[in-house]
């Protein structure tokens, strides 16, 4: 079960990013430092009380300007709202209501997503109430005064947010497996879709950029339904025309987020390019299960060692995806194409898998016995109290510790490797949230979101 999404909306310079940092704290997903893998963070995990969710900062929203990149931001905001359970509209309490705020409010009132109005930069409780009252006329309900920098007032706002977030048991498991077929232009995605479905639904052409929209096809095998989503090829930004193709790429990114499993298609003749690495980082950031589909295998001269040599070369570049299945296929001849769905079944099952708290703590106990947590220069040692799985799709495990800052990146990677070694989660990324002991102690700061 994936975490519900909360979209953070607002014009530029009202403190949206500061607010997102307040909610997410140190919980940003750990990524590798290989050049080209990471990109600017948009989706970040957050939690309040007993509820986990994701927040997405959509960028500064402006409606009366069509200069470069502003249309993208508006499109990103639309896409975020389409998948969000709720939206938080952030305004500047010190500046007061502006014409841009009113335009955004009018747009939000036309959406079906519930909206919570956050009046930021209210540093004084008494003055904040006065500042917030000026925003009643926007027609979005009660304005909540708060300070993203200091955290005051965020508790009341987040309590209101929880009313719109579904409890985990309210979201039923879906029988259908959603599979996004993604990759650079002209690596054979549409040919692969046609081979899997047996139909010429997508336009197959050697001209890069032929597929502009996300195309859904439903196939059934052995009683299991698969929704296959072909997408526009992901290319470097400098090569993108900010027209139909740009929005096609945005839809491709959205397809990744709505998928259970991503078929990451690579051209064996090209190997792993820099753009492939960036796309791989995007897939991991969105927490999708992955099958690495190496296409055009029919074009390679082979002997008994060729497949092992290519696997080694590819994984040297995609080492951060060493948990994903890699399958060599030919969409043109059909070689091993049907075996792809076997890999999808395994990845989807692992992506949805839930492990008991007892098993998680057995793994932690053994890991700590082999390698104790690090000690700071001041002689203070990290301590892991316990761990528990908080969500699936992807599997996310919260580790409650005395101080997250006492656990360096090396030790965090060690713990993740132990979970991989003992629990598998083959084909799926996993996320570890390191939470301080004080996170659940709300008595001292009931109206303040706590960074950890």
Curated annotation (Swiss-Prot):
Domain of life of the native organism: Bacteria
Residue intervals of the EngA-type G domain: 4-169, 177-352
Record text on subunit structure and interactions: Associates with the 50S ribosomal subunit.
Keywords noted in UniProt: GTP-binding, Nucleotide-binding, Repeat, Ribosome biogenesis
Binding site for GTP 1: 10-17, 57-61, 120-123
Position of the signal peptide: none
Keyword GTP-binding tagged: yes
Cited function: GTPase that plays an essential role in the late steps of ribosome biogenesis.
Disulphide connectivity of cysteines: none
InterPro entries, alphabetized: AAA+_ATPase, G_ENGA, GTP-bd, GTPase_Der, KH_dom-like, KH_dom-like_a/b, P-loop_NTPase, Small_GTP-bd
Pfam families to which the protein is assigned, alphabetical: KH_dom-like, MMR_HSR1
Biological process terms in GO annotation: ribosome biogenesis
Protein's UniProt keywords contain Cell wall biogenesis/degradation: no
NCBIfam families per UniProt: GTPase_EngA, small_GTP
GO MF term list: ATP hydrolysis activity; GTP binding; ribosome binding
PROSITE patterns (UniProt xref): G_ENGA
Domain KH-like: 353-439
Name assigned to this protein: GTPase Der
Organism annotation: Synechocystis sp. (strain ATCC 27184 / PCC 6803 / Kazusa)
Record: residues binding GTP 2: 183-190, 230-234, 295-298
Membership in a protein family: Belongs to the TRAFAC class TrmE-Era-EngA-EngB-Septin-like GTPase superfamily. EngA (Der) GTPase family.
